[in-house]
């Protein structure tokens, strides 16, 4: 994540406008964390907040796994860091879509020790956050046209569905994951799917039907 923060700092530094800057260190959750903090700022005193992040495959391999030159084998449970970037502007004024609720997640550690199976490690926290959101809002999964997680990947997605079902919530029909959607499993060998700060951002166009009123 350090290379992403350094790149963001250099981008902001070289602008003529000297705008305030927060460097958010959140790994796969960076964009959503930025949106949560940005929406709180807009609700309070900010007029416009730009939320942006990025990730890069080779940088992530070097930083968190092994340099590509080593030629290490990747287990089937591993995921492929997305080389991608994107941004969203939150504003006090506009026609939407709106951020109406935010539910920050808690640390949920189920004791997963395999560093190559991040989907299994992250799925319990996603499930806890989702159910907390349902309880806080009084809503059920059927209220939403789409429930989309950031980068649990193929393995994490199935675990999340099973965990929700074990607690009485059926999310199978309207739930998907950006790590599953970003790559074509049949033609691209990315094992358990995509991951990284740029994973969900690269699929931000999913929100376009919301703006057009196609989904609510």
Model-inferred region functions:
Residues 1-7, 11, 204-215:
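Single conserved hydrophobic/aromatic residue that forms the stacking wall/gate
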Residues 9-19, 41-43, 64-73, 164-169:
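A glycine- and small-aliphatic-rich helix-loop capping segment at beta-alpha/alpha-beta transitions
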Residues 7-26, 143-158:
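Conserved beta-ketoacyl condensing-enzyme motif
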Residues 67-131, 136-139, 172-184, 211, ...:
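Condensing-enzyme catalytic core mediating Claisen C-C bond formation in acyl metabolism
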Residues 19-26, 72-77, 111-117, 187-196:
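A short glycine/serine-rich beta->alpha loop
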Residues 24-52, 90, 194-207:
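Active-site-proximal alpha-helical scaffold in enzymes
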Residues 28-29, 53-59, 105:
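Acidic, glycine-rich active-site loops and adjacent beta-strand->loop/helix elements
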Residues 147-203:
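Internal helical hairpin/lid segments
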């Amino acid at each position: 994540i350090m290379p992403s923060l350094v790149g963001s700092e250099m981008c902001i530094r070289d602008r003529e406008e000297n705008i305030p800057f927060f460097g958010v260190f959140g790994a796969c959750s960076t964009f959503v964390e930025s949106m949560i903090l940005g929406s709180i700022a807009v609700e309070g005193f900010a007029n416009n907040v730009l939320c942006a992040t990025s990730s890069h495959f080779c940088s992530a391999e070097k930083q968190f796994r092994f340099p590509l030159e080593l030629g290490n084998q990747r287990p089937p449970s591993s995921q492929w860091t997305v080389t991608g970037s994107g941004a969203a502007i939150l504003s006090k004024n506009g026609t939407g879509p709106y951020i109406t609720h935010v539910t920050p997640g808690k640390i949920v550690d189920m004791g997963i020790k395999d560093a190559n199976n991040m989907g299994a490690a992250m799925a319990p926290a996603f499930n806890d956050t989702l159910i907390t959101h349902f309880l806080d809002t009084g809503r059920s999964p059927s209220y939403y046209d789409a429930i989309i997680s950031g980068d649990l990947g193929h393995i994490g997605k199935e675990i999340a569905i099973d965990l929700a079902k074990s607690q009485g919530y059926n999310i199978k029909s309207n739930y998907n994951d950006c790590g599953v959607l970003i790559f074509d499993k049949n033609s691209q060998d990315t094992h358990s799917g995509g991951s990284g700060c740029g994973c969900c951002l690269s699929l931000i166009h999913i929100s376009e039907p919301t703006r057009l009123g196609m989904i609510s």
